[in-house]
C-alpha cells in the first residue's frame, strides 16, 4: 500500500470551493451525451455553409459553452479539458485519466522528441518505478528537496517490507545505481539514455495536466568523462526543448538558467524553458540539469580514465512531461475551446459532409471520401465525420471545441462545382471561411498545406506578441512589485542574495523564472541592492 502523511483534496474542491459553481461542462456532460439530436439543417440551396436553426445553435452553444477566459481562467481551463474530451478525474484524489484525444497530443510530443533524442545519440530504456528509500537518502539535497512529495510502499504481499520503497518521483538515484554496474572505463562513455515513464509526486495543490499526483514524462540521463561534455549535453537538450516549443507547439518559451533557490535538488545548474500562459502566469515547460558529480560521488559511479586513474563521471538529466499539454491549452485556447497548432494536432483537417435529401447523400459522401483520400495520401492527418446522428451545426461546434485547425465542408452545390469550403479555427466567423476551393487533388492539397503553415505561424506570432507585451523592464524593487501586482512579468538586473530572492517571493508571490540566455549588453545595477549586476532576471507568478 502507499502511505503518506498528506491527504489530497479533490481537484474540483481545490479550484472550486463550495460557494462557487463547478465548470459548466462538468454539469452538462451527461445531458449532452444522452440528448437526442434533431435532423440535419441545411440552407435551401444545399450549399456547404448551412445556416443552422437559431434555436439549435443556441442549444448547442449552451451545451458546450465554456466559462469565458476573462471571467475565470481556471474554470475556463477545466471546461475546455472536459468539453474537448482531453482528460477526466481519476478515482484517487489528485489523479487524472488522460482520454484518447488528450493522449494523442502526448503521442505527437513523443513522436517528435523520440526522433530528436535518437538523432543526438540517446537510446530508450526503462527503469523500475520502485526505488529503495536508501537510494533517495544517499544524496542529501535530493532527499531534502523531494521528501514532502514522496509516496512510500511499506507493505507488499501482505507483509511489512524490510525497507520502504519509493514510488518513482524521478530516477537519478536508480539510474546511478545501474550506471555503477555498466560504467568501468572511459571507453564506456558517454552513456546516454532516455525513458518514457510515469512518476508520482504527492502534490498538495493539483491541476489537470499541470500538477497531478501521477504524470507522464520522458527523462534523459547521461554520464560523461569531463565537465565540459556534461555542460554541452545539458545545453543541447534545453535547445532541443526550445526548438520543439517554438516549431511544434507555437509556444514562444524563454530559455535560461534557474537561480540557486530554484535549481533542481541535486544539480549544479538547472536550465529551463519558461512559457507565458493566457493568464500571464509562467509555466516551467521543460528542464535540463547539469548534475556535476553530485550523484556519481554519492553512488560511487566511477570510470578508469586513459591513464588508468579512477574518476567520478559527470552527469546530466532532463525532462518534459504531460504538463506541455496543459501549456498548449492555456497558450492558444479561446472562449470557443481548444486551439491546436497544426504540427501537434492529432487531426489537422476535419471534413464535414452536408446533405438535405437522401438522393444527395451518396454523391456528397463519395466526394468527401475522395478528398479525405487525397489529403491522407499527402500526409495530412484528416478525419471524415460522416455520422448521420449529428447535425452539421453540432459537428461544427464539436470540432471547433476540439481545436481542429481546418474544417472542410462539402455540400451538393460544392459537388456540382467540384469545390469545397474551408474554414480556419484561428480566424472566427466569416473572415476565416473561404468558398470555391477546387477539389482537384494537387490544388486542394497545396492549399490545405499552405493554410496549415499559415495557422502555425499565426499562432506563434500571436503568442509571441502577447508574451512580449506583458514583460515589463524594471530597475527598482518598487517597479518590480508594480509589474507583478498588475499581472505582468518583470525583467530587471539582479545580483542580490538568496535571502533577497526569498523576500521577493514572500512579498509578491513571484519567483525568478530564469536568467535568460539572451541578455542585454552594457552596465547594469541590481534592482534590489544597487550593486553591479551582470545579468537580468525574469520574475513572475507561476504554476
UniProtKB/Swiss-Prot annotation:
Keyword Repressor: no
EC number: 6.1.1.15
Annotated stretches, region: Disordered: 41-63
A Pfam cross-reference name: ProRS-C_1
Name listed for the protein in its UniProt record: Proline--tRNA ligase, chloroplastic/mitochondrial
The keyword Translocase is annotated on this UniProt entry: no
Organism: Arabidopsis thaliana
PANTHER family: PROLINE--TRNA LIGASE, CHLOROPLASTIC_MITOCHONDRIAL, PROLYL-TRNA SYNTHETASE
Record SUPFAM superfamilies: C-terminal domain of ProRS, Class II aaRS ABD-related, Class II aaRS and biotin synthetases
Catalytic activity field: tRNA(Pro) + L-proline + ATP = L-prolyl-tRNA(Pro) + AMP + diphosphate
PROSITE patterns: AA_TRNA_LIGASE_II (PS50862)
Function: Catalyzes the attachment of proline to tRNA(Pro) in a two-step reaction: proline is first activated by ATP to form Pro-AMP and then transferred to the acceptor end of tRNA(Pro).
GO molecular function annotations of the record: ATP binding; proline-tRNA ligase activity
NCBIfam families, sorted: proS_fam_I (TIGR00408)
Cystine residue pairs: none
Annotated knockout phenotype: Lethal. In heterozygous plants, aborted ovules.
Biased composition (Basic and acidic residues): 53-63
GO terms of biological process kind: embryo sac development; plant ovule development; prolyl-tRNA aminoacylation; regulation of photosynthesis; seed development
UniProt subcellular location: Plastid, Chloroplast; Mitochondrion
Protein family per UniProt: Belongs to the class-II aminoacyl-tRNA synthetase family.
Annotated Gene Ontology cellular component terms: chloroplast; chloroplast stroma; mitochondrion
Keywords, sorted A to Z: Aminoacyl-tRNA synthetase, ATP-binding, Chloroplast, Ligase, Mitochondrion, Nucleotide-binding, Plastid, Transit peptide
Enzyme class: ligase
